[in-house]
Structure formats: structure tokens, C-alpha cells
Amino acid sequence: MMQKIQRFGSAMFVPVLLFAFAGIIVGISTLFKNKTLMGPLADPDGFWYQCWYIIEQGGWTVFNQMPLLFAIGIPVALAKKAQARACLEALTVYLTFNYFVSAILTVWGGAFGVDMNQEVGGTSGLTMIAGIKTLDTNIIGAIFISSIVVFLHNRYFDKKLPDFLGIFQGSTYIVMISFFIMIPIALAVSYIWPMVQSGIGSLQSFLVASGAVGVWIYTFLERILIPTGLHHFIYTPFIYGPAVAEGGIVTYWAQHLGEYSQSAKPLKELFPQGGFALHGNSKIFGIPGIALAFYVTAKKEKKKLVAGLLIPVTLTAIVAGITEPIEFTFLFISPFLFAVHAVLAATMSTVMYMAGVVGNMGGGLIEAVTLNWIPLFGSHGMTYVYQILIGLSFTAIYFFVFRFLILKFNIATPGREKDEQQETKLYSKKEYRERKNKDETASAAETADDTAFLYIEALGGKDNITEVTNCATRLRVSVKDETKVEPDSVFRALGAHGVVRNGKAFQVIIGLSVPQMRERVEKILNQ
């Protein structure tokens, strides 16, 4: 059950990967339309402003079509076969569901307490999805419907029908079944969701009122649950869902950047919900402190090697906000250190929130700069000065706390391991190429294919693998016999940052190239 929950959580990350670039475009466009910074150039009737307005509207694509992206994205990770067809089925069924909801509320809206004559948005509980006026179920509805379609797809896509009904096989069969299932679901949603919307409104008020305590708990859970893969369920309702802001913090913040840039009111007063998106500060300020502590406490003869390991993963965490490569270098060595990391991350976010820092800062430096500092520094500069000062203070706190704990408890962090060589059955890439009669001067693609093959071998071979999926940085694999899987040292030798083991379920921490690695692994498995 835990494995299924983890896979479901990782599936939500597929569309999330699209938000980074879109956020940068919106942030830069807002900056170049800001009258305070650009002066006469920011005249709405001028060519400069109009050009950036056009560019900005393109950047809004993923924010304005979030439910559609989640409906299409879920099958990419969860469909076990014919993922492209599963995406088409999910989109078709999701639109069908919304047409049913729209029709039901148009005919019987009074019975369900919904007035379809209202304008969409605001407190109406209504929205437009692909031109359909329907209940605003946000990404929750999209994920729910898409998950049903994926279940039906995995179960019935290959079902053989009589020859005279052959035209209804495959995707058509899934859509047919789903069509009739959507009718009672649409009825149920039309009855239940207005009550849920009322509850969400109360939840938003409660979480905002919880203030610093709520921010601490949220940030702590977002960090501490990373090893389980369940952290997706913590941040997604806040960042992309309606837990504290209509449309999610990402969308709401981007929509109001222009307004905030023109206001002299404190940011915390303008958008108190922004305290629930400060968890990226631990990536920008906390990780450097951890990395420095690892380097300082490493053995003298291993410092150069440790620096080579830490510099790229630290920069990845700071700039892109991807922390798993460095966090997994010490998570399994010392879970206690990871718990300390979660406590410090939560405390940093809370202190910043109490100092008036809010915004969309769940990622790395790119997100902080383009969606916060650049567009808003002109009118809220001191807020970000406080943020940087607090952040650098916590960099020092991280360093001294981690250094003390590593030395006090003699923790075998990178560069402090015992010099023991583990024997492995896995042959090297060179030996593999020789066995395959391949030229040593292989292309990058061929080398990547070799690595994929070696990962398969490390996981017990093709016959031992039953399922392969991925999230942002992890290759998630189910195997028949976990005893055939090689030790972690083998995976690290291949370039992995670590391995999470949970019975027959394995998560190989590869990094941002994991989607390409999954494709290569699947290609080899299907040969």
C-alpha cells in the first residue's frame, strides 16, 4: 500500500516540472512592465509594454490550465502500458466529466445550491475548463478523474472484444466504460463539492490564522517526509491547490505580482498565505551550511574528492531547488541528521515569516530571484534584505550544528567513511562495452544506454523487474526478488546518489536526468 501511495505522490510531479520555466517568464515580464523600475517604458500604450504583455500571456499557459495538465500528466507516471493513449483517454474523460457537471448544475443547480448564472471565479465556486463552465474542483478533481481512467486503462486496455466489436477495443473501450462511470461521479461531485468548497474556505482561514506555528509545522512535514515520498501530499494542496489560496500559491502569487509591486503595504499584510511557500529557503541557505560542514569534517586526504562530490549537488540545490542528491548522501547514514535538517528548515522559514517575509519561494534561487526579488525589490527591498540576513545566519547555524553533531557522534558523512572496498558482481562499463563489441569512443546516448543496462543488472536483471516509474529525481522500481538487488555501493559507482529500499520497492536517486534514464531502461526491458 505504501508503495502505491508513493507512486501516486510522485505522479503529481510530472506536470509540476513545467512550472519553473513558466514562472520565470511571468516574473521577468512583470519586472519589465513595472513603472517604478522601467519608467516611461512601462506605458501600457507603448510598444515595450505590449511586447512584454504578449510574452507574459504565453507564460500564463501552465498556470491557467493547471487542471488539464494534471489530468494529462498523471497517466505519464502511472499508466503501465501505452502511456500516450492513456493521456488521451484521461483528457477525454476529464472533459466529459466536466460537461456532465455543467449540465447537471444547469438543469438542477438550485437543488444542489449552485447558481450557474454567476460569473466564474471569486466565491462562486465556478470556473472555466476548456470552455466549459463547471464546478471548480481544481487539480483535486483532475487528479481524481485521471486516476480512475488510469486504473481502467491498466485493467482493460488490452481486453479482447469479439471481432465485430473490434473497433471499440483499446482507448475507445476505456472511454466508453468511463463515460457511464462519470455520470454517477458527476452527480456525486455536484452534491458534495459545494460543501467541500465551504470547508476549504474555513480551512484557509484556519491555516492563515495559525500564523508562525502553522508555517513551522508545514515546513517541517514537507522536509521530514521526503524519504517516504509523501511530501508531495503536503506541499501540493498549498502550492498548486486551494488549501490557502484560490488556485494555489504559485498561481495566486503570480497573478498579483503587479499589484504587490505597486503597493507600499508590507508583503505579509498583502499575502499572509505566502508563509506556506518559504520552504525553498532551506535549499538556498541551509544546504550550503551542510555541505561546508561535510567538507570541513572530511579526512584531509579525501577533501578534494568530497569537494568534487559536494560542489555540483550543492549548486543544484541552491540554484534549482533540487536537494535530494545531497540529502541522500547523509539520510541513510544518519537519519538523525536529516531530522535536525528538517527542524532547522522549519525554524528558518518561521523566523523569516515572523520578520515579514512571504512569497513564492518553494524552489531554488532562480525562483526566488525571478518571482520575488527582481519584480518586488523596488517596493519591498527591506523585506528581502531581512530574508538574506536571516538566511545567511542560518547558513552559519547549519554549519556549526552539523559540524558539532558529526564530530560528537563520529558520523560517517562523505569523506569520513572507513576505507573498505565492497566486492560487487557488477562489471564495469568498459567490460560491458567489450562484451557488446562496442567502440570505447561511444556517443553520449550509447554511454547512457550502457548505464541504463548496468542499472538493470544492479536491480537483478530484466527478469527481476516488474515495474518502472519515476518522479523528479528518483527511478522507482518494483522487483520480484529484493535479494538479487546489488548493495548501494554499486549504484553509487554508476552515478546514483543513493537507494531507498522498502521491501520489493526501490527508489534509485539519479537526479534531474531520471526521465531520460527511465525511457532508456524501459527501452531495454522491452527489447
From Swiss-Prot:
Protein task: The phosphoenolpyruvate-dependent sugar phosphotransferase system (sugar PTS), a major carbohydrate active transport system, catalyzes the phosphorylation of incoming sugar substrates concomitantly with their translocation across the cell membrane. This system is involved in maltose transport.
Signal peptide per UniProt: none
Record-level GO BP terms: phosphoenolpyruvate-dependent sugar phosphotransferase system
Major subcellular site: membrane
Residue intervals of the PTS EIIB type-1 domain: 449-527
Entry's induction text: By maltose; repressed by glucose.
Residue ranges of every copy of the PTS EIIC type-1 domain listed in the record: 1-418
Molecular function in Gene Ontology: kinase activity; protein-N(PI)-phosphohistidine-sugar phosphotransferase activity; protein-phosphocysteine-sugar phosphotransferase activity
Catalytic activity: D-maltose(out) + N(pros)-phospho-L-histidyl-[protein] = alpha-maltose 6'-phosphate(in) + L-histidyl-[protein]
CDD domains assigned: PTS_IIB_glc
Protein name: PTS system maltose-specific EIICB component
Transport as UniProt keyword: yes
Leftover remarks: Maltose uptake in B.subtilis occurs only via the malP-encoded specific PTS-dependent EIICB(Mal) and not via another transport mechanism.
InterPro entries on file: Glu_permease_IIB, PTrfase_EIIB_Cys, PTS_EIIC, PTS_EIIC_1, PTS_Glucose_EIICBA, PTS_IIB_1, PTS_IIBC_a_glc, PTS_maltose/Glc_sub_IIC
